[in-house]
């Protein structure tokens, strides 16, 4: 298992929560971004800088993530791609993308984009809050516990 982070837009506090979980559970993390990222003191965290361009980081993650991996992303099309291969995707606000909800989330995203382009809706998501951070930490903990349990061979 590996944790992939779509790092360009991921809040720093979320990355820090993931790094702590990585250290505690000895799970490797791979940050993928279009720009250079800060170096990390642990061998468990790898940073990959991809070329500039639309969806280049998303494409890299989708091409390299395995079904047993966890992807942290706010990008709904990337989450849909991960779920389609049987992978697990978690939003930085703690929402788990599933086969049951990712299609609806994608449709809602597309609708909101059209409404914004038409000037009918302004702004984007609400500012990242302490509640979002706590929800993410709780969701990540539950999810990693479940994924680790599912990976253990039954004896």
Swiss-Prot record:
Pfam families tied to this protein: DUF188
Q: Which InterPro entries match?
A: UPF0178
Q: What domain of life does the native source organism fall in?
A: Bacteria
Identify its protein family.
Answer: Belongs to the UPF0178 family.
What is the protein's name according to its record? Answer: UPF0178 protein Gmet_1725
Q: Which organism is it from?
A: Geobacter metallireducens (strain ATCC 53774 / DSM 7210 / GS-15)
């Amino acid at each position: 298992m590996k944790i992939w982070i779509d790092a360009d837009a991921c809040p720093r506090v979320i990355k820090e929560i993931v790094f702590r979980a990585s250290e505690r559970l000895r799970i490797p993390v791979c940050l993928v971004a279009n720009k250079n990222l800060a170096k990390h003191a642990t061998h468990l965290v790898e940073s990959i800088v991809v070329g500039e361009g639309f969806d280049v980081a998303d494409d890299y993650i989708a091409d390299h993530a395995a079904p047993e991996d966890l992807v942290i992303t706010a990008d709904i099309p990337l989450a849909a791609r991960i779920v389609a291969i049987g992978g697990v995707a978690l939003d930085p606000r703690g929402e788990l993308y599933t086969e049951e909800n990712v299609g609806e989330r994608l449709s809602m995203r597309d609708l909101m984009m059209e409404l914004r382009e038409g000037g009918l809706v302004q702004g984007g998501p609400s500012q990242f809050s302490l509640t979002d951070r706590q929800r993410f930490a709780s969701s990540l903990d539950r999810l990693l516990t479940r994924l680790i349990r599912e990976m253990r061979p039954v004896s």
